[in-house]
């Protein structure tokens, strides 16, 4: 199996209007979507679309209606004139722990049958239950950089008139996902996630859980705690204007 676990850190650094920094330890799963049934059968304490200590549910991603994520990815590739024949799809995300998860960012890596990356989908969620997916065609897998305009309200302390610059590594022994956010050509936020690879086995899953117990509950608590600290620093609260459910944009 090619699915694996990454243990690492998440870092956020805000530069404007005031400096704010935090760093948390996390673990993520990189799941080959074609292996989910096998993982469900072979990995203790992990389930697919069923409750367990650690689990993965289709309804947490894509159309969020429980439909197969492979079909959702293929549909969006076809709509963006990217071939969906003989592809492999891997998803980097947090799992559910005791049935709960919040994924601020999930990344779909799409490979052709030569194991070349041909597309990346950045699935962004906010705490209002909304989601926006940015779809990119990969033109050079040795230089995985993408930029686009911000199309989705995420933080109540950052305006919408911003742009994103994504820099990532092709998953291997390490992962790296970096997002720089700019406003009027000034960098206002740096966010990153890194990790070191571990095999997806029962023992490694338990080790990762014990290093980060109740991680997904801590993530949502940390989001609100850091927001409170921003508010105490006097940073302006920005009201969300639009209500959406699940938007997608094709960026190139």
Predicted regions and their residues:
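Mature, function-bearing regions of proteins
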Residues: 1-252
